[in-house]
């Protein structure tokens, strides 16, 4: 699964330059010349993406009208002589079009946003985006006869409608990714329409697109949340790490140039600025391919692909190997300089260079692990600057930096050991118990969804070679925890979760690992209704039966978050005995009515609830 791989690879999707040449804090300029124009863009599809993502509940007819109106506005404001690929920032005009359609803005609860101006208006619209709005059902591909007929009658409208349906269901998905997957879908249609078994063809091929959509959408939402909550400094550190691993033979200045453009393009993509998101992404991908000799030996085949496929290919390309001649470690990287005498700007530059050098020497480490090492190194330098012998202090401390890698390796080994012993289902149950204790405020479906992803990640990562398990597991955990933190941002869960989500990006996963029980949680009064058993427990099979058992497990832990492992094992054994006794008899319902309350009474007495 793509999301199991370190999510930070998505940072290579797009890089950009601003409408005016921009520089970072160290005076390093953007790579690209802002006077260069990109290829002609399909503004109809881009405008459709914008309106479908910002007004998700709008009908296709309503979106099409707004698209037509905004294109008229753009043509008037840019003039016929200006190429479509050189559009200035049109974001305010797009938002104004939504507000101009008062019936639409009022109908879909956006009138409060329209009463605001400029940045406040934009932020209000962004806040209204919902990852899974309940009013929009999951997308279903029409049966082949209908799809093939519609495609043949008007291909452009058919594909534009598909783009609309995808964009409204994935409001955080970057425009280039939507267009790339739509292009893939466009290739599937004629093939499957000619296939002997069109239904099977569509089901098989579109399932891959659906999976890619879901995973890419989660990645993009995750990236935007990281940028929003941890700010540009953390985002730059993340990007320095990933780019230094991906392009390990590039020099530091080249990496810094790329980092500058990464930050800008992701800011625009997260803002929903579809025009710049696509246009600048195309430019930077062209630049990367023109600089293969100094960047990477792994992207030659990618650079032969069409521009929309190019980005996804580079994302999945292997990291370049460790350059020859690099020293194995970075001992005394500071030399004899006094770190505390550096200015804030000098400290940032020094740490960026340390992160660059460390990352290109450790191309298989997960990004959060590298950042934990870098954070630990900075804390070490600040401490040693106060000591009588700074160099000796550094020498001892640098050896201790390995603890961050060792902690992550130990967790990966422990998780994979549990997976091998328990299997995916029982490993999920272990995660369920742990996370119900950490976050008992979550609903049973939420707990089951989060822990199912954890167990699936373990099943995937633990099949890999040992040297790849760490990066796989840390990357997956970072994404899942990121989703949990987005959930906390929407509706606060508890102080412990809040602390882990906001204090340090690098230490988010270790923080969650160290959480045990939410001591602020007060269980609701015992309700026998949550522990009534019926004969459907005997009739259920597979996933349905597992879900019923997990529901019981969650309710049990929520009733007593401090439950010990021994107590839990005893209750589960009693529960299994109840199932065996009642399901083997003829009067199953009567058995549950008689024996169920006995089990609950025994459990309550044992747990003191």
Curated annotation (Swiss-Prot):
<feature type="disulfide bond">
    <location>
        <begin position="148"/>
        <end position="193"/>
    </location>
</feature>
<feature type="disulfide bond">
    <location>
        <begin position="500"/>
        <end position="511"/>
    </location>
</feature>
<feature type="domain" description="Albumin 3">
    <location>
        <begin position="403"/>
        <end position="601"/>
    </location>
</feature>
<keyword id="KW-0732">Signal</keyword>
<keyword id="KW-1015">Disulfide bond</keyword>
<feature type="disulfide bond">
    <location>
        <begin position="99"/>
        <end position="114"/>
    </location>
</feature>
<feature type="disulfide bond">
    <location>
        <begin position="384"/>
        <end position="393"/>
    </location>
</feature>
<feature type="modified residue" description="Phosphoserine">
    <location>
        <position position="115"/>
    </location>
</feature>
<keyword id="KW-0964">Secreted</keyword>
<feature type="disulfide bond">
    <location>
        <begin position="582"/>
        <end position="591"/>
    </location>
</feature>
<comment type="subunit">
    <text>Dimeric and trimeric forms have been found in addition to the monomeric form.</text>
</comment>
<protein>
    <recommendedName>
        <fullName>Alpha-fetoprotein</fullName>
    </recommendedName>
</protein>
<feature type="domain" description="Albumin 2">
    <location>
        <begin position="211"/>
        <end position="402"/>
    </location>
</feature>
<dbReference type="GO" id="GO:0005737">
    <property type="term" value="C:cytoplasm"/>
</dbReference>
<comment type="function">
    <text>Binds copper, nickel, and fatty acids as well as, and bilirubin less well than, serum albumin.</text>
</comment>
<feature type="disulfide bond">
    <location>
        <begin position="113"/>
        <end position="124"/>
    </location>
</feature>
<feature type="binding site">
    <location>
        <position position="22"/>
    </location>
    <ligand>
        <name>Cu(2+)</name>
    </ligand>
</feature>
<keyword id="KW-0325">Glycoprotein</keyword>
<feature type="disulfide bond">
    <location>
        <begin position="538"/>
        <end position="583"/>
    </location>
</feature>
<comment type="similarity">
    <text>Belongs to the ALB/AFP/VDB family.</text>
</comment>
<keyword id="KW-0479">Metal-binding</keyword>
<dbReference type="Pfam" id="PF00273">
    <property type="entry name" value="Serum_albumin"/>
</dbReference>
<feature type="modified residue" description="Phosphoserine">
    <location>
        <position position="344"/>
    </location>
</feature>
<feature type="signal peptide">
    <location>
        <begin position="1"/>
        <end position="18"/>
    </location>
</feature>
<keyword id="KW-0533">Nickel</keyword>
<feature type="disulfide bond">
    <location>
        <begin position="224"/>
        <end position="270"/>
    </location>
</feature>
<feature type="disulfide bond">
    <location>
        <begin position="269"/>
        <end position="277"/>
    </location>
</feature>
<feature type="disulfide bond">
    <location>
        <begin position="289"/>
        <end position="303"/>
    </location>
</feature>
<dbReference type="GO" id="GO:0046872">
    <property type="term" value="F:metal ion binding"/>
</dbReference>
<dbReference type="InterPro" id="IPR021177">
    <property type="entry name" value="Serum_albumin/AFP/Afamin"/>
</dbReference>
<keyword id="KW-0677">Repeat</keyword>
<keyword id="KW-0765">Sulfation</keyword>
<feature type="domain" description="Albumin 1">
    <location>
        <begin position="19"/>
        <end position="210"/>
    </location>
</feature>
<dbReference type="InterPro" id="IPR020857">
    <property type="entry name" value="Serum_albumin_CS"/>
</dbReference>
<feature type="glycosylation site" description="N-linked (GlcNAc...) asparagine">
    <location>
        <position position="251"/>
    </location>
</feature>
<dbReference type="InterPro" id="IPR014760">
    <property type="entry name" value="Serum_albumin_N"/>
</dbReference>
<feature type="disulfide bond">
    <location>
        <begin position="485"/>
        <end position="501"/>
    </location>
</feature>
<feature type="disulfide bond">
    <location>
        <begin position="461"/>
        <end position="472"/>
    </location>
</feature>
<feature type="disulfide bond">
    <location>
        <begin position="302"/>
        <end position="313"/>
    </location>
</feature>
<feature type="disulfide bond">
    <location>
        <begin position="416"/>
        <end position="462"/>
    </location>
</feature>
<keyword id="KW-0597">Phosphoprotein</keyword>
<dbReference type="GO" id="GO:0005615">
    <property type="term" value="C:extracellular space"/>
</dbReference>
């Amino acid at each position: 699964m793509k999301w199991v791989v370190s999510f930070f690879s998505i940072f290579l999707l797009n890089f950009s330059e601003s409408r005016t040449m921009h520089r970072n804090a160290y005076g390093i300029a953007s790579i690209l010349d802002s006077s260069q124009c990109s290829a002609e863009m399909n503004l109809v599809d881009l405008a459709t993406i914008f309106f479908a993502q910002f007004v998700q509940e709008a009908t296709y007819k309503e979106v099409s009208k707004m698209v037509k109106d905004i294109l008229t506005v753009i043509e008037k404001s840019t003039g016929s002589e200006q190429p479509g690929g050189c559009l200035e920032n049109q974001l305010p005009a797009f938002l104004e079009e939504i507000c101009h359609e008062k019936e639409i803005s009022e109908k879909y609860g956006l009138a409060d946003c329209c009463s605001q101006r400029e940045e406040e208006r934009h932020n209000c619209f962004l806040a209204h985006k919902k990852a899974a709005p309940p009013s929009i059902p999951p997308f279903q591909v029409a049966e082949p006869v209908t799809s093939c007929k519609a495609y043949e009658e008007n291909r452009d409208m058919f594909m534009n409608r598909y783009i609309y349906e995808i964009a409204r269901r994935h409001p955080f998905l970057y425009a280039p990714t939507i267009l790339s997957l739509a292009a893939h879908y466009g290739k599937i249609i004629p093939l499957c329409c000619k296939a002997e078994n069109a239904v099977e063809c569509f089901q098989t091929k579109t399932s891959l697109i659906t999976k890619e959509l879901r995973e890419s959408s989660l990645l993009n939402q995750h990236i935007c949340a990281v940028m929003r909550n941890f700010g540009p400094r953390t985002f730059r550190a993340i990007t320095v790490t990933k780019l230094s691993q991906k392009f390990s033979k590039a020099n530091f200045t080249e990496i810094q140039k790329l980092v500058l453009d990464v930050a800008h393009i992701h800011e625009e993509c997260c803002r929903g600025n579809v025009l710049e998101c696509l246009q600048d992404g195309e430019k930077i991908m062209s630049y990367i391919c023109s600089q293969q000799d100094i960047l990477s030996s792994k992207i030659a085949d990618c650079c032969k692909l069409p521009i929309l496929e190019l980005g996804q290919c580079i994302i999945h390309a292997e990291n370049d190997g460790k350059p020859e001649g690099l020293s194995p470690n970075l001992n005394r990287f500071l030399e004899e300089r006094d770190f505390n005498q550096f200015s804030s700007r000098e400290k940032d530059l020094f740490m960026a260079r340390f992160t660059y050098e460390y990352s290109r020497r450790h191309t298989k480490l997960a990004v959060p692990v590298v950042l934990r090492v870098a954070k630990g190194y900075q804390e070490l330098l600040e401490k040693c600057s106060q000591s009588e012998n700074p160099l000796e202090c550094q020498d001892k401390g640098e050896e201790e930096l390995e603890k961050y890698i060792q902690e992550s390796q130990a967790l990966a080994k422990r998780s994979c050991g549990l997976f091998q012993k328990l299997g995916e289902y029982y490993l999920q149950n272990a995660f369920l118990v742990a996370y119900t204790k950490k976050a008992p405020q979550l609903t049973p479906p939420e707990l089951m969804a989060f822990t199912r992803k954890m167990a699936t990640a373990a099943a995937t990562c633990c099949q890999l070679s040992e040297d790849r398990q760490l990066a796989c597991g840390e990357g997956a955990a970072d994404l899942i925890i990121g989703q949990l933190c987005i959930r906390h941002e929407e509706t606060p869960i508890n102080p412990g979760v809040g602390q882990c989500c906001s204090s340090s990006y690098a230490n988010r996963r270790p923080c969650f690992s160290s959480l045990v029980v939410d001591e602020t949680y007060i269980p609701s009064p015992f309700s026998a209704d949550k522990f009534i058993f019926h004969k459907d427990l005997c009739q259920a099979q597979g996933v349905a039966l597992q879900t019923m058992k997990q529901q019981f497990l969650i309710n049990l832990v929520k009733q007593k978050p401090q439950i010990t492992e021994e107590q839990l094992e005893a209750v589960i054994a009693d529960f299994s005995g109840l199932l065996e006794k009642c399901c083997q008899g003829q009067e199953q319902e009567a058995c549950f009515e008689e024996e169920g309350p006995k089990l609950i009474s025994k459990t309550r007495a044992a747990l003191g609830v």
